[in-house]
Amino acid sequence: MKLTCMVIVAVLFLTANTFVTADDSGNGLENLFSKAHHEIKNPEASNLNKRCIPFLHPCTFFFPDCCNSICAQFICL
């Protein structure tokens, strides 16, 4: 029972985190393909190259994207 509750909470947290951190959520899918085409022409314009979290900024345990450190207690150390 406790494990089921923990799994439900984890799924809800990850779902909320996905919606909060989604890029360009206001436009939906209307500019998805044009943006992808632009990023193929110019790979340096891709947002994937710029997604690391600096030192002492908030991070998540499940998706630790710290630049040169680790995520401990929800802060990049």
Swiss-Prot record:
**Annotated GO MF terms:** ion channel inhibitor activity; toxin activity
What keywords tag this UniProt record? Cleavage on pair of basic residues, Disulfide bond, Ion channel impairing toxin, Knottin, Neurotoxin, Secreted, Signal, Toxin
- Look up keyword Ribonucleoprotein and say if it applies: no
Question: What disulfide bonds does the UniProt entry report for this chain?
Answer: 52-67, 59-71, 66-76
Matching InterPro entries = Conotoxin
**Compartment(s) of residence:** Secreted
Which terms in the GO cellular component ontology are assigned? extracellular region
Q: Which positions carry the propeptide annotation?
A: 23-51
Q: Main localization of the protein? A: secreted
The record's comment about this protein's domains reads: The presence of a 'disulfide through disulfide knot' structurally defines this protein as a knottin. The cysteine framework is VI/VII (C-C-CC-C-C).
Q: Return the similarity comment.
A: Belongs to the conotoxin O1 superfamily.
- This chain's protein is named Conotoxin Vc6c
